[in-house]
Amino acid sequence: MSRLRIYDDTRPESPLLDTQDGAVIAAELQKIGVTFERWQATAPVAPGASQEEVFAAYRADIDRLVAERGFKSVDVASIAPDNPNRAELRKKFLDEHFHKEDEVRFFVAGSGLFTLHVGDKVYEIECVKDDLIAVPDGTTHWFDMGDEPSFVAIRFFTEPDGWVGHFTGTDIAQKFPRYVPTQAS
């Protein structure tokens, strides 16, 4: 189940809010310009599935979102727990960074933890199958897929290099706990 925890950015041990209520998650994130929606991931795909398999399964959803929002590029992040590069892939986005365009992800299998740093608050969003999240450009954040990553997310971009992270150099991400999935997805 999706989960949101909000913290003061100096108190990682004490959440100000901890909820699994989708309506509350969406409302709280909307306050900071983040879109959170529950969609239906209707075609079964397993973590580690190829981009071609995921595109074939979700072509109608992809085409609709591209048409609605003007995306120019789409790819798939699909990582299974047995991926030999999982530690390297996990480390890639564990430090605070931002993108120069909106970061839009639709989780069609598994889970991962987006952590946003906005003002003096930290928002941990556990995204699971059926979650669509859109993080506005310039929002500082990090992403943790866990020790044994298991997820498939369709990623949407307005520019081909939109996925490139611009790192802030702060150590705030190390002050917050690493991701341990709360459910099997």
UniProtKB/Swiss-Prot annotation:
Cofactor: Fe(2+); Ni(2+)
EC number: 1.13.11.54, 1.13.11.53
Cofactor note: Binds 1 Fe(2+) cation per monomer.
Keywords: Amino-acid biosynthesis, Dioxygenase, Iron, Metal-binding, Methionine biosynthesis, Nickel, Oxidoreductase
Pathway assignment: Amino-acid biosynthesis; L-methionine biosynthesis via salvage pathway; L-methionine from S-methyl-5-thio-alpha-D-ribose 1-phosphate: step 5/6
Residue numbers binding Fe(2+): H97, H99, E103, H141
InterPro entries, sorted: ARD (IPR004313), ARD_bac (IPR023956), RmlC-like_jellyroll (IPR014710), RmlC_Cupin_sf (IPR011051)
Site feature location: Important to generate the dianion: R105
Reactions mediated catalytically: 1,2-dihydroxy-5-(methylsulfanyl)pent-1-en-3-one + O2 = 3-(methylsulfanyl)propanoate + CO + formate + 2 H(+); 1,2-dihydroxy-5-(methylsulfanyl)pent-1-en-3-one + O2 = 4-methylsulfanyl-2-oxobutanoate + formate + 2 H(+)
Residues annotated as binding Ni(2+): H97, H99, E103, H141
Site (May play a role in metal incorporation in vivo): E96
Source organism, top-level taxon: Bacteria
GO biological process entries: L-methionine salvage from methylthioadenosine; L-methionine salvage from S-adenosylmethionine
Marked site (May play a role in transmitting local conformational changes) residue numbers: D102
GO molecular function per UniProt: acireductone dioxygenase (Ni2+-requiring) activity; acireductone dioxygenase [iron(II)-requiring] activity; iron ion binding; nickel cation binding
Free-text function comment from the UniProt entry: Catalyzes 2 different reactions between oxygen and the acireductone 1,2-dihydroxy-3-keto-5-methylthiopentene (DHK-MTPene) depending upon the metal bound in the active site. Fe-containing acireductone dioxygenase (Fe-ARD) produces formate and 2-keto-4-methylthiobutyrate (KMTB), the alpha-ketoacid precursor of methionine in the methionine recycle pathway. Ni-containing acireductone dioxygenase (Ni-ARD) produces methylthiopropionate, carbon monoxide and formate, and does not lie on the methionine recycle pathway.
Entry's family note: Belongs to the acireductone dioxygenase (ARD) family.
HAMAP family: Salvage_MtnD
Subunit organization: Monomer.
Protein name listed in UniProt: Acireductone dioxygenase
UniProt lineage: Bacteria, Pseudomonadati, Pseudomonadota, Gammaproteobacteria, Lysobacterales
